[in-house]
């Protein structure tokens, strides 16, 4: 059972091609419109307000408490958990601080041994978290 051949087969071939496109992951992702239902709603970064600092236990076989922050996004009010990278960087973040959040690198999936965390903190109060960590800049007084 191959594909349809012949002079009048164009419509059928076109229809089959359109139907088979939905088997392609990238096509489905770009055409279903689910990107707008996600917390970032199609953008790469988002600003949010820190609600609380939390520790999330690492998955087996690792044993650690990964430092994260519960953040409410300004654009749509959704609450997400965001990982705070580097040793001691959680000390630079206070509750009610404005933070910039980015994706965590696996296209919407959790990374490594941190369950359910798909985002990371990039900036705190408009200052890069890396600059604060390396003591190149100070957090502005509010």
From Swiss-Prot:
Domain of life: Eukaryota
GO biological process: translation
Signal sequence extent: none
Modified residues (Hydroxyproline): 61
MF terms (GO), sorted A to Z: mRNA binding; structural constituent of ribosome
This protein's UniProt keywords: Hydroxylation, Ribonucleoprotein, Ribosomal protein
Any Pfam family matching the protein: Ribosom_S12_S23
One Gene Ontology CC term in the entry: cytosolic ribosome
Sequence similarity: Belongs to the universal ribosomal protein uS12 family.
Protein name stated in the entry: Small ribosomal subunit protein uS12y
Organism phylogeny: Eukaryota, Viridiplantae, Streptophyta, Embryophyta, Tracheophyta
Gene: RPS23B
């Amino acid at each position: 059972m191959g594909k349809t051949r012949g002079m009048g087969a164009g419509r059928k071939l076109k229809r089959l091609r359109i139907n088979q496109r939905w088997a392609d992951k990238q096509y489905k992702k770009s055409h279903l419109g689910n990107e707008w239902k996600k917390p970032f709603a199609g953008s790469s970064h988002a600003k949010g307000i820190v609600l609380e600092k939390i520790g999330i236990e690492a998955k087996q076989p690792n044993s650690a408490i990964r430092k994260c922050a519960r953040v409410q996004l300004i654009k749509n009010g959704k609450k997400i958990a965001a990982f705070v990278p580097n040793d001691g960087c959680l000390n630079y973040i206070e509750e009610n601080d404005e933070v910039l959040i980015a994706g965590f690198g696996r296209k919407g999936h959790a990374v490594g041994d941190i369950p359910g965390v798909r985002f990371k903190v990039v900036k705190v109060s408009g200052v890069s978290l890396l600059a604060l960590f390396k003591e190149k800049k100070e957090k502005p007084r509010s």
